[in-house]
Amino acid sequence: MFYALVHYPNIETSLINDFRCKYDPNKNLIEPHITFVFLVPESVGETSLVLHIESVLTNWRTFPIHLKGLQKAWEHWLFLILAEGNEEVIRLHRELYTGILAPYQRPDIEFVPHVGLGLFARKDANYDIRNPQQLSLDDEKYFQALEEAQRLALDYSCVIDKLHLVKISDDVSEIVWSREFVLSA
């Protein structure tokens, strides 16, 4: 079992979900989200993790974000990126990866605040969520999806006001909500 900390943007997600139905292998596992803490093993302990998150969040207030723009990341993902609020999300991400989470930070993977839209790995590749960079890009499928996403002109504004701790099964076949953290207004 693993834990992750995510934000579910309070936006109309029908266009994103329709797109993800075609291209995102995780579409049925989790709603469109921004990940603040990636997979952390349950051995860290839920109580310790919750206390750490609460401690970090005591210094944070709600803040606006603007989702607009597309970016290829980790060589095979298409992301809806932040046009506003990027610095705040990165700063909060870094603060969360202190203390008990410091050993789990992945400096080898660039943190790009985003909503994942699709995975474009060649069919012969096996995707490992714990090591997302180890795939080859399916160029044809990626460029087709990129054109489609550009036509959608995805553009959303919302506020980061809550983060959600989720539990993820070892085989990444099930994600269960665990706890909500509300930022001060």
Task: Show which residues each predicted segment covers.
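Basic, often amphipathic N-terminal segments
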Residues: 1-66, 72, 83-162, 171-185
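Short, basic/glycine-rich phosphate-binding loops at helix/coil junctions
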Residues: 71-79
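Active-site-proximal alpha-helix that buttresses catalytic centers in soluble enzyme cores
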Residues: 164-166
